[in-house]
């Protein structure tokens, strides 16, 4: 059974109770771990549409999973792998530009 981590993105309005839950993804059983916030690394991350300028520098991953891309602040995000997907900064650059 796979194990995953839930991260609230943008205005998703997450109101989750921390714990371990069973679920399915693509017909496969998964174990979902919802962690309580512990500070900066758990902050809500805003999803950005393809073609829009990146608000911060860093590694961007499509919402729902996929390959990461490196995008400097102000550069346009590439087309997403699937229609309707947005990008989220999962690893901000550790310098002034990556802080937003």
Curated annotation (Swiss-Prot):
Region annotated Disordered, chain positions: 40-100
Induction field: Part of the Rv1954A-higB1-higA1-Rv1957 operon, which is autorepressed by HigA1.
Protein origin, superkingdom: Bacteria
Other notes: This gene is encoded entirely within Rv1954c, on the opposite strand.
Name of the featured protein: Uncharacterized protein Rv1954A
């Amino acid at each position: 059974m796979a194990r995953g981590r839930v991260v609230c993105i943008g205005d998703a309005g997450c109101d989750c109770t921390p714990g371990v839950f069973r679920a399915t993804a693509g017909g496969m059983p998964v174990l979902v771990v919802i962690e309580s916030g512990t500070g900066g690394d758990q902050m809500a991350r805003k999803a950005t549409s393809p073609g829009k300028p990146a608000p911060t520098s860093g590694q961007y991953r499509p919402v729902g999973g996929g390959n990461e891309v490196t995008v400097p602040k102000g550069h346009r995000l590439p087309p997403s792998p699937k229609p309707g997907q947005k990008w989220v900064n999962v690893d901000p650059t550790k310098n002034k530009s990556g802080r937003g």
